[in-house]
Amino acid sequence: MFKVVGKLLQIGEKMLLGGMQGMERVVQSDIYPPYISLVTGPPGSMKSSFCMTLLTNHLNRTGEFGLYCTVEETVDSLMRGATSLGLQLPMNLQVTDFTELRRENEDMDYLKFTRKMIEHFKQTHGDRFTTFVLDSLGAIYSLTTVDEAMRKKMFSFFDFLRSMNLNVLLITERNLGSHAELQGNEGFLADAVINMGMDHRNGKLVRTMQIEKMRHIRHAMEKQAVDVGPHGLVVLGPLFD
């Protein structure tokens, strides 16, 4: 079904992409802030699990501070998901959900609120605050009108994220079979696009990861098989037809 190839590089223990076992076979070097990555894919493709694996293992090793914001899922649900992956969320990870805020204020400006939260934690933790995950852009789009004004807001939001000097993982939905049909202009603005998916192989459903775009970094573009290991997701190796 798949073949494990030799390592493309050696990833240092404290690198963000080193938080997922097997990524050393896929990328030649790590990403350094400011860097914005889109994590895309259909429902059930483990986008959140991918981000939580990278973030949790990285923060456990480095002692840096990270922020995970979820628009739809509660903190309790995320924690149960992390436990099922074998991940122990560190104290230096702040998980915040917007579910209560959404119920209280239907007209809430989520991008503005997120900016204020990032600014707060940057003031509190300084350069120790290195990593941010937003789960998800699709949820924010579903709660707002996607028009020219929203696209300008998104452009400004990406500029803001870069100004905060963070490694950023933005989760967004993508339907099965589509290549780059994202809802706004974020596909052009992001430094990397990592597509999570599912393939049918030998009568089984295999979860996959594929790097479609990654600026400044040499990377393999083959579709990779992924599975749950002892400490979150792991890359098993490339899939071949």
Predicted feature locations:
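C-terminal regions of RecA-like/P-loop NTPase motor modules
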Residues: 1-13, 220-241
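Pre-Walker A adenine-sensing motif
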Residues: 18-30
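Conserved P-loop
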Residues: 33, 37, 42-108
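Structural motif
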Residues: 38, 131-135, 169, 194
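Loop/turn-to-beta-strand initiation segments
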Residues: 65, 92, 127-131, 163-171
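Conserved nucleotide-binding/hydrolysis micro-motifs of P-loop NTPases
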Residues: 72-76, 99-103, 137-139, 174-178, ...
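Phosphate-binding/switch loop-helix module in NTP-utilizing enzymes
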Residues: 102-164
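Phosphate-binding/switch region of NTP-binding enzymes
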Residues: 167, 172-232
